[in-house]
Amino acid sequence: MNDLKRMNIKELEDLCENMREQIIEVVGKNGGHLGPNLGVVELSIALHYVYNSPEDKIVWDVGHQSYVHKILTGRKDKFHTIRKKGGLGPFTDPNESVHDQFISGHAGNSLSAATGLAMANPDKDVIVIIGDAAFANGTTLEALNDINGKIKNLTIIINDNEMSIGENVGAISEVFNKVINSHFYLKLRKDVRKLLSRYHITKPIVKPTERLEQSLRSIVTPGGFFNILGYDYIGPM
């Protein structure tokens, strides 16, 4: 972990490549979840680069996305045993490592667990990684409503990969399906600012332009959904 924090960008990129190769090799032999883990390699490394686990709590909503997390937290030499009798489990498990906050299988309960961890550890950061499919889970929405943007040491990362075992349905799913529209918003904002700059139009309409920008942002990005609930939204990234 300390070695990770001393790496430069090139070394981190090489680490990502090595992680992918290791996961592909082991999953090819043992079975397991290949796509979900390959999709969070950079994210997992970034989290452990920035935060200090286990003091800071990293919570995975879907345990079978935690392969990189396992490798980075002292289980690299045992990774070849994953899903084998007596080997590493396929999900996070606090009995396996202090870096695992709770036993997680499939989707939905991470935000509730993370809320409790954040309240119990107000001087530490708690980070929860949850997918777009899991976000429509009832327990997730209950936790989202309960938090109401008031727990300041909790960061929610939505892995909007449009992947799930079954088809995502419902209004919440539709909100995340609109994320592509945010690229339209970003391009529109850039074009408007370029136009104003070209004609040297600045201060007289700064405030109206800012209000228009805020209105557009609330309409065409999923951030509006979270802003209404009291959260600071950054994205998409």
Regions inferred by a protein language model and the residue ranges of each:
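Gly-rich Lys/Arg/Thr-decorated short loops/hinges at beta-loop-alpha junctions or inter-strand turns
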Residues: 1-3, 21-26, 88-100, 124, ...
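Generic structural signal for well-ordered, non-membrane alpha-helical segments
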Residues: 12-16, 36-40, 106, 110, ...
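Short beta-alpha junction loops
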Residues: 133, 160-163
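A short alpha/beta connector and helix-capping loop motif
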Residues: 137-159, 173-182
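Cofactor-binding active-site loop characterized by glycine-rich and histidine/acidic residues
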Residues: 33-150
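N-terminal amphipathic, basic-rich helices that act as targeting or association modules
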Residues: 1-73, 225-230, 237
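Long, well-ordered, tryptophan-enriched scaffold segments
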Residues: 162-237
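Hydrophobic anchor at the start of a short beta-strand
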Residues: 126, 154, 233
